[in-house]
Regions:
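Active-site core of metal-dependent hydrolases
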Residues: 1-92, 100, 106, 182, ...
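Predominant activation on well-ordered alpha-helical scaffold segments within soluble catalytic domains
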Residues: 24-27, 31, 96-99, 120, ...
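Helix N-cap and loop-to-helix transition residues
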Residues: 19, 53, 94-96, 118, ...
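Active-site microenvironment of metallo-dependent hydrolases
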Residues: 104, 111-277
Length: 277
């Protein structure tokens, strides 16, 4: 479906674009749509935007859009520097410039294709400006303090689902979503942020995870979905003892038939299954 009917019907959209050249083309189209249909208050947004320019940030602000950023550069920073140089990597993405322009900004992971789903790795990247390999990419003006980084992960993200005021903060009348952490995020050394974890997770007022001193509160795993999944009725879909170790190295040989196959023999003989995880 094109942007014109989406704007006409007041349906939000998101566009995935890493390079500014792509964002430029997308904004040209959105501006044409905006001449006939308002795109404000739709909560549309651009994902990624690592190389977006100040001009296009301002265009997004004028059109009422947002930007969702992810910590892909924490994993790909060295490769970006090798190709484009350290100077070009300093503002990938230009987070504080986005915030200064008044654009709604939310943080996530883009897992599991290009980054870990671990939020603490993302928060470490936002605060330190370093890759997981320790390469310093960002100057101080493109790094966030810990509170601001955490708010991008919580309160700010509610804008993108049109749920501002309903979730994202531990306050009355919002969803009771919270986590008790293994250590204090605000006081641990920078290099320990990525190692944090939740020992108690509450979602909608219900405990959904417990470990360490909260192990006794840890609920059983929910049954596999959908309810017709063969995992719920057939034991041969379960990993047998020892097979996990056997398949752990499977993706080192990507050619068809070169894996150590699992018991069912399905993913292995079709070639590399890295894409599935």
């Amino acid at each position: 479906m094109g942007l014109f009917p989406m704007a006409e019907n007041r349906w939000p959209w998101r566009l995935h674009a890493t390079y500014n050249e792509t964002i430029e083309l997308a904004l040209n189209a959105i501006e044409r749509v905006a001449k006939d249909h308002s795109v404000h208050n739709l909560h549309w947004f651009i994902d990624h935007a690592e190389t977006i320019t100040a001009r296009n940030i301002d265009r997004i602000a004028c059109l009422g859009g947002g930007i969702a950023i992810q910590h892909r550069m924490a994993y790909q920073g060295e490769y970006f520097i090798e190709r484009y140089g350290a100077k070009a990597a300093e503002f990938t993405p230009p987070i504080n410039r986005m915030l200064a322009a008044g654009v709604p900004v939310g943080a996530g992971t883009d897992a599991t294709r290009v980054a870990s789903y671990n939020p603490w790795v993302s928060l470490s990247w936002l605060v330190t400006g370093k890759t997981v390999g320790g390469t310093a990419m960002y100057p101080a003006e493109n790094r966030l303090d810990r509170e601001r980084a955490l708010r991008l992960w919580t309160e700010a993200n509610a804008w993108f689902s049109s749920e501002s005021g309903r979730k994202g903060a531990i306050v009355p009348d919002q969803w009771a979503d919270l986590a008790v952490l293994s250590a204090d995020y605000f006081t641990v050394p920078d290099e320990e942020i990525s190692g944090l974890s939740s020992v108690l997770t509450i979602l909608g007022g219900k405990i959904v995870h417990g470990s360490d001193e909260y192990q006794d509160d840890d609920p059983p795993l929910p049954p596999a979905m959908p309810d017709w999944s063969p995992v719920r009725s057939r034991s041969d879909f379960l990993v047998r003892p020892g097979e996990r170790r056997q398949t752990a190295h499977a993706c080192v040989a990507h050619g068809p038939t070169r894996h150590s196959h699992d018991g069912a023999g399905f993913w292995g003989h079709l070639g590399c299954s890295c894409w599935a995880f």
